[in-house]
Every structure is written in structure tokens, then in C-alpha cells.
Amino acid sequence: MARTDIRPIVKLRSTAGTGYTYTTRKNRRNDPDRLILRKYDPILRRHVDFREER
């Protein structure tokens, strides 16, 4: 099995609408749904939710 099959690279986009993104890997077996992480948005200078985009 290829490396990207189990842990694909996904983009996390800010829900605040600034357009800022993070890239990360996720495990499809543990997280089959869209990933939502609370991370720092440097444009707003505060922590906001970042949601996986497809």
C-alpha cells in the first residue's frame, strides 16, 4: 500500500474567511470525517477553527 493511501495530505482552511491554510496529514482509519482543528490564524492574530477542504 502506498504511503499516501493511509495518511493523505490535506489542507486545513480557516473558517474565519481569511483564506489562510495549513497542510497536515490525517489517518483515514481514525478520522474518516472532515478534520476540524483549532489553530492560530496570523491574519486575525487569534485562534480559530480550521476545517479540512476537499
UniProtKB/Swiss-Prot annotation:
GO molecular function, one term: structural constituent of ribosome
GO cellular component: cytosolic large ribosomal subunit
SUPFAM superfamilies cross-referenced by the UniProt entry: Zn-binding ribosomal proteins
Presence of the UniProt keyword Ion transport in the record: no
GO BP annotation list: translation
Keywords: Ribonucleoprotein, Ribosomal protein
Transmembrane spans: none
Superkingdom of this protein's organism: Bacteria
Alphabetical list of InterPro entries matching this protein: Ribosomal_bL33, Ribosomal_bL33_CS, Ribosomal_bL33_sf, Ribosomal_zn-bd
Record-stated family: Belongs to the bacterial ribosomal protein bL33 family.
PANTHER family registered for this protein in UniProt: 54S RIBOSOMAL PROTEIN L39, MITOCHONDRIAL, LARGE RIBOSOMAL SUBUNIT PROTEIN BL33M
Protein name as catalogued: Large ribosomal subunit protein bL33B
